[in-house]
Amino acid sequence: MKAQDLREKSVEELNAELLNLLREQFNLRMQAATGQLQQTHTLKAVRRDIARVKTVLTEKAGA
């Protein structure tokens, strides 16, 4: 996910995307805790995607 793509979305779309990413992060954390997660790098990728969405939301709030 690229920040430029996120900047083209509306605030409502970004909030929906953030909610989906947070749910995905929760599910991945549960899989990691139970030892079912094979691709541990996905946790890092989702965490960074969440940060990107939050950054763009902050930019839009300030503008």
Curated annotation (Swiss-Prot):
GO terms for cellular component: cytosolic large ribosomal subunit. GO terms for molecular function: structural constituent of ribosome. The keyword Isomerase does not apply. The keyword Oxidoreductase does not apply. Keywords: Ribonucleoprotein, Ribosomal protein. It comes from the Bacteria. CDD domains: Ribosomal_L29_HIP. Pfam families: Ribosomal_L29. One of its GO terms (biological process) is translation. Belongs to the universal ribosomal protein uL29 family. HAMAP family: Ribosomal_uL29. This is Large ribosomal subunit protein uL29. It comes from Vibrio campbellii (strain ATCC BAA-1116). The gene is rpmC.
